[in-house]
UniProtKB/Swiss-Prot annotation:
MF term (GO), any: proton-transporting ATP synthase activity, rotational mechanism
Keyword Transmembrane helix carried by entry: yes
Classification lineage: Bacteria, Pseudomonadati, Aquificota, Aquificia, Aquificales
Protein name per UniProt: ATP synthase subunit b
Family assignment from sequence similarity: Belongs to the ATPase B chain family.
GO cellular component, one term: plasma membrane
Gene, per the UniProt record: atpF
Length: 180
């Protein structure tokens, strides 16, 4: 029923506004205002629910967007803090790795020095042993040479100092020494 009344008022207002071309301007202004009020009333009547629904939906949508933006901001803050924490952990692990690497390198260096010293000591011992062996060989050769020379000298002395008479006496003494 309300719809019919409003529609009738609209039609009437439009017809009055259109008929009075010769009327004064105040009447035209009045009917324009009436038409505007009627138009706004019709828009409100027919579209009020939809407009309210749209505006409420828009308000809720904006509120949800604000809440979502706040949540995203909080999440990004948490992610930033987490990234900072992970960066600090990575720095700490890197420092620990460097420290361990330096300690390992130092131990390896000391171990290498110790092994080199042991090898040098073994080489010294082998050299001393080789020198001692060579000295003994040289002494043996020298003794052999000295014995050979002594024999040669003795032989030549004996041959030059022994004559047949001395030779017979020596043979007799040796035989007597063997018999006894």
């Amino acid at each position: 029923m309300k719809k019919v009344v409003l529609f009738t008022l609209l039609i009437t207002g439009l017809s009055f506004a259109g008929e009075q071309k010769e009327a004064n301007e105040s009447m035209i202004l009045f009917w324009k205002a009436v038409n505007t009020v009627i138009l706004l009333g019709l828009v409100y009547y027919f579209g009020g629910k939809h407009i309210k629904k749209f505006l409420n939906g828009r308000r809720e949508n904006v509120a949800n967007m604000v809440l979502e933006a706040q949540k995203m901001r909080e999440d990004s803050q948490k992610a930033l803090e987490d990234a900072k924490r992970k960066l600090e952990e990575a720095k700490y692990k890197l420092e620990e790795s460097i420290k361990i690497s330096k300690e390992t390198a130092e131990r390896e260096r000391e171990h290498a020095i110790m092994q080199a010293n042991e090898i040098a000591e073994r080489i010294k011992m082998q050299a001393k042993e080789t020198i001692n062996i060579e000295i003994r060989k040289a002494e043996a050769k020298l003794k052999k040479y000295a014995a050979e020379k002594a024999l040669e000298v003795s032989k030549s002395l004996i041959e030059s100092s022994i004559n047949p008479q001395t030779s017979n006496e020596l043979i007799k003494k040796t035989i007597k020494g063997l018999e006894a």
